Structures are given as structure tokens and as C-alpha cells.
Amino acid sequence: MKFLFDLFPIILFFVAFKVWGIFTATAVAIVATLAQVAWVAFRHRKVDTMLWVSLGVIVVFGGATLVLHDEKFIQWKPTVLYWLFAIGLLAARYAFGKNLIEKMMGKQLTLPVPVWDKLNVAWALFFAVLGVANLYVVHNFTESQWVNFKLFGTTGAMVVFIILQSLWLTKYLKDE
């Protein structure tokens, strides 16, 4: 259910784009992300840092898209967000000694520290590659193809990555 909740702004962006175009879709994404943060704050009294970062990036890049009437800003937003996630994962681990992947998943999985470190680097690399892939699609395909990639391509890549990661992790999990 959380996965669908996380996709809420992207799905609304996709639908709004198909019906009204990029600029209305951008406004819808900003409002949807604001609503998402408000709901999480109301429901849980705490909003994850990643969601705050997502909100900041969509407001800045979406706002620039609307004010300057230039769709490139909203198209760059996923790359900036993915690269911030990648940098955040690596900086937290190597500058501050905190493995954010372990912090998020440590209650569900018991893994040795070197495995957590590999997982952290794998996620950072995954986000870095997604950022590059987004730029490639932005500059080599139509706006409509980019919107399809944004919803289906990146979501599909995420699902495949999680499945592969799960298969890799099975060798480290003990029978409980």
C-alpha cells in the first residue's frame, strides 16, 4: 500500500498530462505532493526526510516550469531527485557513519554490516543510473515518451531492482 501511496503524485501527473498537458500536470504534481506530505504529517506526526526532499524538488523545479513556462525543469526533476538520493546515501554512510538503507530496513532484516554497505552502494548506484537514464530520455525522446518512461520505466526498473536485490539477499538470511 505504501508503494501505491508513494506513486500517488506520479500517477496524478501522468493522468493530468494525458488530459491537459505538461503544465497542468506539473501543477497537479505539486499539489499532490503537498497533499501527500500533509497527509503523512497529519497521520504519523513525522515526515520522512526523503518525502521532504521530494517536496522541495517538485516545488522548485515544478515552480520553475510553471513560472518560466519551460517543461525542461520538470523533466530534470527526477534526475536531480535521484542524484540527491544517491549522494545522500553515500554521504550518510561515508561522511557520517550512518547506513540509511539499514536504518530503513534493519527491523525487517538481520544482515552483516558489509552486506548493508553493499546494499547501500547498490541503491546509490541504482539512483545514479536512473538519473542518467532520465536525462537520456529527456534529450532523445518526445515529451509524451518521457512521461511514459517516468511512470512505467522507472517504476518497472525499481520493481526489477527490488526483486534482484531480494534474490541476492536470500543467501545472507538465516532461517528464522
Swiss-Prot record:
Keywords: Cell inner membrane, Cell membrane, Membrane, Transmembrane, Transmembrane helix
Keyword field contains Cell membrane: yes
Topological type in the membrane: Multi-pass membrane protein
Keyword Membrane (UniProt): yes
Cross-referenced InterPro entries: YciB (IPR006008)
Transmembrane segments: 3-23, 24-44, 49-69, 72-92, 121-141, 149-169
HAMAP family on file: YciB (MF_00189)
NCBIfam families per the UniProt record, alphabetical: ispZ (TIGR00997), PRK00259.1-3 (NF001325)
Name this polypeptide is given: Inner membrane-spanning protein YciB
Lineage: Bacteria, Pseudomonadati, Pseudomonadota, Betaproteobacteria, Burkholderiales
Gene that specifies this protein: yciB
